[in-house]
C-alpha cells in the first residue's frame, strides 16, 4: 500500500506563486498601489518628501558605517570585477540609451526619452545588489564595494554624462554638484568617520537595520509615485506610451543582464564573482537617482523619473526570480567544482 501521508504532493498554483514572489517585491508593488490609491498631497506630501530625503541620507550613512576602510582597500584588489561593473553602468547603459534614439520619436515623448537617457546614466545600487547577490550566493563583499564605488563615482559621472547626452535640459552647475554631495556624499563620509562607534551597533542589529534599509526604499518609492499621481504624470501618458516605455525598459534590462553574464563568463570569473557582476552591473539606484533628478531637472523632474521608477520595479522583480534560481543551483555548482578539484588531486 502507498502511504499517502508521506507522499510529496506538488504545490498548488497559489503555493507556487507564493514561493515565486519575493516578499520585498510584493511590498514594492503594494507601495505603488498605495501611492495610486492614496497619494500624499499638500502638507502630507511635503512631510513625506522630507522624510524620504532623511531616509536617503540615513541609507548612505549606513553604507558608510558598514564599509570598513580595510574592506574598501581590499575591494580594490578585484579591480577587474569593478572595471566590468563600471563599464556596464557608465558605458554599456548609455550606449543602449543612445541606441533607442531611433525608436524614441515613434514610441516615446521627448520627456520620456530624456528620462530613459537619465536612467541609463544613474549609478548602480548598493542595497538591492547586495541583497540579490547574497540570495544567489555570490561574492557579497565585492558587491558591497562595487555598489559603493558606483554610487560615489556616480555623484560626479552621472551629472557629467547627463549634461553631455541630454544637453540643455540638464541644469548642470557647481551648486548642483554641491547639493548632490551634501545629500549623498556627506552622510556616507559621516558614516565612515563614526564607524568606530556605529559598527558594533550595526553588527548587533543587522535584521532591524535590514528592515530599515528596505523601508527607506519603500518610502522613496511611495514619495516618487505619489508625486507622479498628484502632478498628473500618469494622465499625460497614454497606455500605448506606457507599454512602449515598459518594453524599452525591459529590453535595456535584458540586454544588460545578457551582456554582463556573457562578459563575466568569457573573462573567466568565478561563479560567485559572475553573480556579483550581473546584479551590480545591471541594477540602477532609485535612492541615488531621485535626488539627482531633482537637482538636475528641477520642477521638470516629474516625467523624467518615470522610466527610472518603472525600471527599478522591473529590475527587482526580474532579478529576484533570477537570484532565486541561482540560489537553488548553487549547491550543484559547488558539488561540481568539488568533483573537479578531487579529479585534479587524483591526477596530480
Segments the model singles out, each with a brief description of its role:
Residues 286-338, 343-348:
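C-terminal transmembrane helix pair
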Residues 101-156, 162-176:
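Membrane-interface helix-loop-helix junctions at boundaries between adjacent transmembrane segments
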Residues 2-104, 163, 167-271, 338-348:
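Structural signature of multi-pass alpha-helical membrane transport proteins
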Residues 29-30, 277, 291-293:
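Kinked, hydrophobic transmembrane alpha-helices enriched for aromatic residues
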Residues 69-70, 76-81, 105-109, 133-142, ...:
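Juxtamembrane helix-boundary/capping and inter-helix hinge elements in multi-pass membrane proteins
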Residues 226, 251, 264, 278, ...:
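Generic hydrophobic alpha-helical scaffold/packing signal
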Residues 79-87, 107-121, 138-148, 176, ...:
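The feature identifies polytopic integral membrane transport proteins across all domains of life
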Residues 26, 88-96, 121-126, 142-163, ...:
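Membrane-embedded alpha-helical segments of transport systems
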Amino acid at each position: 500500500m502507498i502511504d499517502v501521508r508521506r507522499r510529496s504532493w506538488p504545490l498548488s498554483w497559489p503555493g507556487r506563486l507564493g514561493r515565486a514572489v519575493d516578499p520585498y517585491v510584493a511590498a514594492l508593488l503594494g507601495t505603488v498601489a498605495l501611492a495610486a490609491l492614496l497619494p500624499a498631497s499638500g502638507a502630507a506630501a511635503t512631510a513625506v518628501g522630507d522624510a524620504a530625503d532623511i531616509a536617503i541620507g540615513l541609507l548612505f550613512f549606513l553604507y558608510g558605517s558598514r564599509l570598513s576602510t580595510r574592506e574598501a582597500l581590499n575591494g580594490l584588489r578585484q579591480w577587474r570585477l569593478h572595471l566590468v561593473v563600471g563599464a556596464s553602468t557608465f558605458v554599456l547603459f548609455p550606449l543602449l540609451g543612445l541606441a533607442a534614439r531611433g525608436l524614441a520619436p515613434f514610441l516615446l515623448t521627448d520627456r520620456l526619452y530624456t528620462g530613459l537617457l537619465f536612467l541609463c546614466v544613474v549609478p548602480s545600487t548598493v542595497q538591492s545588489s547586495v541583497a540579490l547577490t547574497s540570495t544567489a550566493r555570490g561574492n557579497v563583499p565585492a558587491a558591497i564595494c562595487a555598489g559603493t564605488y558606483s554610487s560615489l563615482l556616480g555623484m560626479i559621472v552621472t551629472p557629467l554624462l547627463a549634461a553631455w547626452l541630454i544637453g540643455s535640459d540638464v541644469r548642470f552647475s557647481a551648486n548642483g554638484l554641491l547639493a548632490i554631495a551634501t545629500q549623498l556624499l556627506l552622510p556616507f563620509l559621516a558614516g565612515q568617520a563614526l564607524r568606530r562607534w556605529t559598527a558594533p551597533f550595526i553588527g548587533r542589529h543587522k535584521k532591524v537595520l535590514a528592515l530599515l534599509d528596505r523601508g527607506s526604499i519603500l518610502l522613496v518609492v511611495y514619495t516618487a509615485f505619489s508625486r507622479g499621481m498628484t502632478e498628473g504624470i500618469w494622465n499625460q501618458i497614454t497606455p500605448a506610451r506606457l507599454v512602449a516605455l515598459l518594453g524599452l525598459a525591459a529590453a535595456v534590462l535584458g540586454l544588460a543582464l545578457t551582456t554582463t553574464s556573457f562578459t563575466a563568463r568569457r573573462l573567466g570569473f568565478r561563479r560567485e564573482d559572475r553573480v556579483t557582476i550581473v546584479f551590480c552591473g545591471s541594477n540602477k539606484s532609485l535612492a541615488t537617482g531621485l535626488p539627482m533628478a531633482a537637482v538636475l531637472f528641477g520642477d521638470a523632474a516629474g516625467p523624467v523619473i518615470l522610466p527610472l521608477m518603472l525600471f527599478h520595479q522591473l529590475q527587482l522583480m526580474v532579478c529576484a526570480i533570477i537570484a532565486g534560481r541561482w540560489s537553488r543551483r548553487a549547491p550543484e555548482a559547488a558539488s561540481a567544482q568539488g568533483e573537479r578539484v578531487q579529479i585534479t588531486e587524483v591526477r596530480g
